[in-house]
Regions:
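N-terminal secretory signal peptides
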Residues: 1-15, 26-31
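C-terminal segment of N-terminal export signals and the immediately downstream linker at the start
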Residues: 35-52
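Typically the conserved alpha-helix immediately C-terminal to a functionally engaged Cys/Sec
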Residues: 59-62
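Conserved dinucleotide-binding and phosphotransfer motif residues
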Residues: 66
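Thiol/selenol-based redox catalytic cores and closely related redox-interacting motifs
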Residues: 89-172
Length: 172
């Protein structure tokens, strides 16, 4: 009678214990890959801004640091803002699109994440003007000054309500 070290199941499949043990690390890597891909790709965000605007560039860096994958159009933002239906009075120096929502101005990444999680029926978020202390307007050139400001939820009809108030302390 011929004896082997294989169990009946491994003999039937031709897969030995060593082969199986060697494949386990590869299986672990394969299972981890989707999360690795998600971690490196981030949430896509498209931005229209003036090529010479430093605060817009700093806001883009803020969004990238928060895990967004940013595509920048250095063509200005007036045309895209008008095309998307944002009232001029809510305008700022850059306009973005993420997850079907418009983001106008220096909106903190945490507020954009909250918007994407809550999924309200709205045009998007806006921080009119350029409040000092908001992301992108918070560098050393501003002397660590942080003014209070509101992030507005903009309805499709152009009306607004406060989405989140920032009291002048460090925003995320």
């Amino acid at each position: 009678m011929l004896t082997t070290n294989r169990s009946d199941a491994s003999a039937a499949t031709g897969i030995g214990r060593r082969t199986l043990l060697g494949a386990l690390p590869l299986a672990g890597i394969a299972l981890a890959m989707p999360s690795l891909v998600r971690a490196t790709t981030g949430t896509p965000l498209e931005v229209w801004k003036d090529p010479n605007c430093g605060c817009c560039h700093d806001w883009v860096l803020h969004m990238e640091a928060a895990g967004f994958t940013v595509k920048v159009h250095d063509t200005g933002n007036n045309a895209v803002r008008a095309r998307l239906g944002l009232p001029q009075k809510l305008g700022s120096c850059h306009t973005a699109l993420v997850g079907g929502y418009l983001i106008e101005g220096h909106v903190p990444a945490s507020d954009v994440r909250a918007l994407l999680q809550q999924k309200p029926k709205a045009l998007g978020l806006a921080v009119p003007g350029m409040p000092i202390g908001s992301p992108g307007m918070d560098g050393p050139a501003y002397g660590n000054r942080r003014d209070p400001y509101d992030v507005l939820l903009v309805a499709r009809d152009g009306s607004t309500r406060v989405f989140k108030s920032h009291n002048g302390k460090a925003s995320t």
